[in-house]
UniProtKB/Swiss-Prot annotation:
Stretches with biased composition (Polar residues): 347-356, 478-490
Database matches in InterPro entries: Velvet, Velvet_dom, Velvet_dom_sf
Compositional bias ranges of the Pro residues kind: 295-305, 415-426
Name by which UniProt lists this protein: Developmental and secondary metabolism regulator VEL1
Sequence motif Nuclear localization signal, location on chain: 40-45
Keyword Nucleus: yes
Domain notes per entry: The C-terminal PEST domain is a region rich in proline, glutamic acid, serine and threonine residues that is required for the light-dependent regulation of development and secondary metabolism.
Localization per Swiss-Prot or TrEMBL: Nucleus; Cytoplasm
Residue spans of biased composition, Low complexity class: 390-404
Keyword field: Cytoplasm, Nucleus, Sporulation, Transcription, Transcription regulation
Gene Ontology CC terms: cytoplasm; nucleus
Amino acid sequence: MATPSSIPAEPKRDVVNRIHRVTRGNRSLWYQMTVLQQPERARACGSGSKANSDRRPVDPPPVVELRIIEGPSVEEGKDITFDYNANFFLYASLEHARPLARGRVNTPAAGNPPILTGVPASGMAYLDRPTEAGYFIFPDLSVRHEGLYILTFSLFETTKEERDFDLEPADGDLPPGVDYRMEIKTDPFSVYSAKKFPGLMESTQLSKTVADQGCQVRIRRDVRMRKRESKPGAGNSNSGGNGFERREEDFGRRRTITPASEDPHSIRNRSHSNSSEQRTPYTDASRRPSMVDSYPPPPPPPSYEPAPSASRHLDFGDSSAAQYPTPRQYAHQPGLQITPGPPSGSYAPTAQSPYSKTDAPYGYVNRNIPPSCPSPAPSVKHDLYDRRQSTSSYVPPSPSVYSTEGHHRRDSRPSYPPTPVAAPRPRPMHSQTSLPALKIDQLVSPVSPLPPIEPQTGPAPELPPINVGGKRKHESVFAQSTRPLHNGQRQVDPHYGRSHRGYSPDHDQGWYSRADGQISSVQFNRYYDE
C-alpha cells in the first residue's frame, strides 16, 4: 500500500508532494505531483435556473504535473512516466479555506452545499512541453457561492499489469484494479459575486503552451478586467497584489471613448413629415419641396413701358423722376401674339384717362374701368424674363391694319371659354378704333403718384346644370303594388296584363315593351293579294 512520505499542512505555490510504494514485482516506484498553475479568482455562478448558462470558470485553470520515477531514490531513479503501463485520473474537490462556525440548526443541505460545478475530473495528458511529463488540466471548474476556498486534488490509478499491484490489498470500497494514491491542495483563492468580480485576466503562457499541444483550454488574448476605484480602508489580502494592479492599468489604457462625428455641421436625416423641412427664408419658386407651399404666386406689379421714338422729343419731367426703378418686363404667354403700340408722337394727350372709351365688340357688356392700369397675366416664368428684348432698343413700326388686327385678336381671345377672374383684363378694342398715346409725365409723376392697384371682382356667371348620366331606379321602370297578397296571389305585372303578350285581336296592330317599361303599340301595313 502506498504511504505518503510527506503531506504538508499548508501547501504553497508549486509545492511538490511525493509518495513511495513497492509493487508485487519488487519495483520501487516514486510518485511526484506538482501544482504548476494555481487558481486565483472566480465568479460565483449561483444556484438558480441560469447557473449553468452563466458560469465563469476558475481563472487561471489549475494545472497539475505528475512524474513516475523508478529507483531507490528520486535523485538516482529513472523517469518512467511515458513507459509505465497504467491509467491515472485526478479528481478535484472544493473546501473552505477557513473552518466555518457551526450554527444552531444543522441541516445536511447547509453542511454540504453543492458549491462546485463543471468537470471535476481530468485524465492525464502526456505532453512534451514545458517538460516531458503527465499533466492534469481543469479548464471547466466553477463555484456557486462567493467566499475563500481551496481545491484538493486526489490521484487515482488503474493498474493494468499484475506485477504493478500493491503488496497488500487496497481499500475494498474501490473497484478491483483502482487504487487511491495521493492528494495535493492548492493555495486559497477568492470567489467574487457578480458585482465585485474584477474580471478575467489574459491567459498565461502555460495555458497557451498546453493549448498549442491540443488540450481544450480557453485562450484570452485581451484583458477582461473591470477597473474599480479603491476605497479607503478596504483591502483584501487575497487580491493578488501587484499582478492585479498591473493588469488594471493595462486595461485602463485600452479603454476608449466612442468618437464624435467628424463633421459638426452635418445635417441629420430628414423627417417624414412635411412640417419639419429645412427651408431657407427666400427659396426659389421653381424648387418647392412639397405641397405645403404649392399655392400660386401673387400677380406681379404692373409694368409701364414707355414708347420711345427716334427723335427723343418727350419730356420726362424733372430729375426727381429718376427715383422710380425700371418696371419689370414680362414675357407673353405662348400662343398669344404681342404687337407694339402706336408711336406716342402722333396723338394728342388726354388728361382724363389713358384709355379711350369705345364700344365693346362681339356682345361684350360695357363695364366702367377705373383709371388704374390692369395687372398683367400672372402665369409667367422666371426663365423667360431675359428672353424679351429691351424696349429702349426696339423701334415700333408705323400703325397699320395688320397691327391693329393683331392687337384685337390678342385682347378678344374668342377661343377660350369665359371663366371667373380675380383681376380685370384689358378692354378689347375694335379693329377700326385705336388708343391715344400715353404720356409718360402723367403716368410717372413725382407730385401725384398712382393710386394702389386693387383687384376688381365680380359675381361669377352661373353655369347651366350638367346632366350627369346614371341608371334609372327600378320603381320608375317597373310598377310595383304595395297591397298584401293572400291565397296564392302574385304580383301583377303590367307587361303581362293581357292574355297574350305581343298579340292583339286586331291583326294589323301589335304590342311591345319599351326600354322604360311602358307598353306601346305598332300598326302593321296591310297587304292584299290580288
